[in-house]
From Swiss-Prot:
It comes from the Bacteria. Keywords: Aminoacyl-tRNA synthetase, ATP-binding, Cytoplasm, Ligase, Nucleotide-binding, Protein biosynthesis. The lineage of its organism: Bacteria, Pseudomonadati, Campylobacterota, Epsilonproteobacteria, Campylobacterales. Aspartyl-tRNA synthetase with relaxed tRNA specificity since it is able to aspartylate not only its cognate tRNA(Asp) but also tRNA(Asn). Reaction proceeds in two steps: L-aspartate is first activated by ATP to form Asp-AMP and then transferred to the acceptor end of tRNA(Asp/Asn). InterPro entries: Aa-tRNA-synt_II (IPR004364), aa-tRNA-synth_II (IPR006195), aa-tRNA-synth_II/BPL/LPL (IPR045864), Asp-tRNA-ligase_1 (IPR004524), Asp-tRNA-ligase_1_N (IPR047089), Asp/Asn-tRNA-synth_IIb (IPR002312), AspRS_core (IPR047090), GAD-like_sf (IPR004115). GO terms for biological process: aspartyl-tRNA aminoacylation. It catalyses: tRNA(Asx) + L-aspartate + ATP = L-aspartyl-tRNA(Asx) + AMP + diphosphate. Residues 197-200 are annotated as: Aspartate. Its EC number is 6.1.1.23. Homodimer. PROSITE patterns: AA_TRNA_LIGASE_II. It is found in: Cytoplasm. GO terms for cellular component: cytoplasm. It comes from Campylobacter hominis (strain ATCC BAA-381 / DSM 21671 / CCUG 45161 / LMG 19568 / NCTC 13146 / CH001A). This is Aspartate--tRNA(Asp/Asn) ligase.
Length: 584
């Protein structure tokens, strides 16, 4: 039916007889000759329907409209010099049509294909139309090449692809599970996996040594621009390895993925401790495409005549005093901008935003009066200030200050256009805390409870670190992993620290504890978020752009209208009764 994709043809094919198929992208009648831009997944080619060559083809062309599906048979010829379109790959040639077939007409469209002003809601409702653009197709072509590259890289490294169950049991992994009622076992439920975590560990206990899977995962959680209820990850696990071994494999896979997309990345990646990332950038996934590293000035503030600042600075365990210097900032920022900066940080818990400006006549700002000259001199030296600079200060509770100053750093970089969109800054963040405190004072595992702790017998739970690592690209977490607990007694200690009693341990994780007791090898792994990776590679604004049929931020599919109700008969079979929630 088809001899070539549209953009496979060029000036080297002049005189060739071809058959091309696709959709009508546009059409126009110029002096009794009809020109059609035919579009397939590769791009566009111009069809010429001239009654001098084929009256029948011309008559059919006169009836076509946008998005009609056509098959055209004809000869390639060169365009006239004044008719060449340099914007098109096929801009030097056209197909003189001898035979034209309408394979299928199209109803009037709800929107023009490729219109950037169409709402996302409409595009998702008619996703099959939205995907017809070459821009969208190319994202999925890139995604396909990346998946193949990942598979080939892992195959080359000796990994075995194994599919783990989709219907499994609920386990506490952080988010809520999607539950599937069992028809056979009334009142019992399967859970869709949040990750293949436990199964891949069991495979290591089964002597598989190296496992991978491009896995589908499900989490019933509140959605953001970079999250979906169902998502894909490149899941990797290996035995007899340490952290460096896993990181080396992760780098090899990412290098091959980017190579398949025409980009070369340098390995090994930079490594940074979690503590340093938080203290210097206010984030466990810092964007290193620009500077503006925090400057710690607590010891200087400790000497301040302002008791509030001094008392904050003295408690170095609970509080932080951080500075961000902007070179030339005093010459760039208006008074209104400075007010806007304060309004921004207040949204994240800041009480205000103190600053000092460096003028020709000296330092200006609300903080200057609270310091002696010697302390001001020390501040100038510490921050390496010069005329025209401005330095911002955040002071208060550790968690709040690091958070809003980290956000403010990114905000400033965007304001100053410091971020190179073409740069690729990879980073490993390591040595995460094993546990984090919840709002109610209890503790949960920062990654998951199967991560190997460095010092499980440390009496202060907040001082226990884990052999965990995240891979970060341009301030976005691509994936994370850890060395796993492979000894039953250590796993039981971690469960105990999480207040999981022995009976509950056996009930929920008995199969894992059994596996660890029968000679489990040291093992570890990593999972790379494939959707998020593709979002970055294709420079998309959301992972919805790189998922063929995504859900909205309300976890709905506007195309199929999922989720949907089921019949009373199905409910009876499952032994379920729906109690509708009251609308708030």
């Amino acid at each position: 039916m088809r001899s070539n994709y549209c953009t496979e043809l060029d000036s080297g094919d002049i005189g060739k007889i071809v058959d091309v198929c696709g959709w009508v992208n546009s059409y126009r009648d110029h002096g009794g000759v009809i020109f059609i831009d035919l579009r397939d997944r590769s791009g566009l080619i111009q069809l010429v329907c001239d009654p001098k060559h084929s009256q029948e083809a011309y008559t059919i062309a006169n009836s076509v409209r946008d998005e009609f599906v056509l098959r055209a048979h004809g000869k390639i010829r060169a365009r006239g010099k004044d008719l060449i379109n340099p914007k098109l790959k096929t801009g030097e040639i056209e197909v003189v049509v001898e035979n034209l077939i309408v394979e299928n007409p199209s109803k009037p469209l709800p929107f023009v294909i490729g219109d950037k002003n169409v709402s996302e809601e409409t595009r998702l409702k008619y996703r099959f139309l939205d995907l017809r653009t070459n821009e969208n197709f190319n994202k999925f072509f890139t995604r396909s090449k990346a998946a193949i590259a990942a598979r080939n890289a892992l195959d080359r490294l000796g990994f075995v692809e194994v599919e783990t169950p989709i219907l499994t049991r609920a386990t506490p992994e952080g988010a809520r599970d999607y539950l599937v009622p069992s028809r056979v076992y009334n009142g019992q439920f399967y859970a869709l996996p949040q990750s293949p975590q436990l199964f891949k560990q069991l495979l290591m206990c089964s002597c598989f040594d190296k496992y991978f899977q491009i896995a589908r995962c499900f989490r019933d959680e509140d959605l953001r621009a970079d999250r979906q209820p169902e998502f894909t990850q490149i899941d990797i696990e290996m035995s007899f390895c340490d952290q460096k071994d896993v990181m080396k494999v992760g780098e090899a896979v990412l290098k091959d993925i980017f190579k398949s997309c025409g980009k070369d990345i340098k390995t090994p990646f930079r490594v940074m401790q979690y503590k340093d990332a938080m203290e210097n950038y206010g984030s466990d996934k810092p964007d290193l495409r620009f500077g503006m590293k925090f400057i710690d000035v607590a010891d200087i503030f400790e000497k301040s005549s302002n008791e509030i600042f001094a008392n904050i600075a003295k408690d170095k365990k609970k509080n932080r005093v951080k500075a961000i210097k902007v070179e030339g900032g005093d010459l760039k920022f208006s008074k209104r901008q400075m007010q806007r900066f304060e309004e921004y940080v207040r949204k994240f818990g800041a009480q205000g935003l103190a600053f000092i400006q460096v003028k020709e006549e000296g330092l200006k700002g609300p903080l200057v009066k609270f310091f002696e000259k010697s302390e001001i001199d020390e501040l100038v030296k510490r921050c390496e200030l010069k005329v025209g600079d401005v330095v911002f200060f955040g002071a208060g509770k550790k968690k709040i200050v690091l958070d809003y100053m980290g956000r403010f750093r990114i905000f400033l970089a965007n304001e100053l256009e410091l971020i190179n969109p073409d740069a690729l800054e990879f980073l490993w963040v390591v040595d995460f805390p094993m546990f984090e405190q919840n709002e109610d004072g209890t503790y949960s595992a920062m990654h998951h409870p199967f991560t190997m702790p460095n010092n499980v017998d440390e009496p202060d739970i907040e001082e226990i670190t884990s052999i965990a690592y995240d891979v970060v690209l341009n301030g976005i977490e691509l994936g994370g992993g850890s060395i796993r607990i492979h000894k039953e007694d250590i796993q039981e200690k971690v469960f105990k620290l999480l207040k999981i009693e022995p009976a509950e341990q056996r009930e929920k994780f008995g199969f894992l504890l059994d596996a660890l007791s029968f000679g489990a090898p040291p093992h570890g792994g990593i999972a790379i978020g494939f959707d998020r990776l593709m979002m970055l590679v294709t420079r998309s604004s959301s992972i919805r752009d790189v998922i063929a049929f995504p859900k909205t931020q309300r976890a709905q599919c506007l195309l199929t209208k999922a989720p949907s109700g089921i019949s009373n008969e199905q409910l009876r079979e499952l032994g379920l009764k729906i109690n509708k929630k009251e609308q708030k």
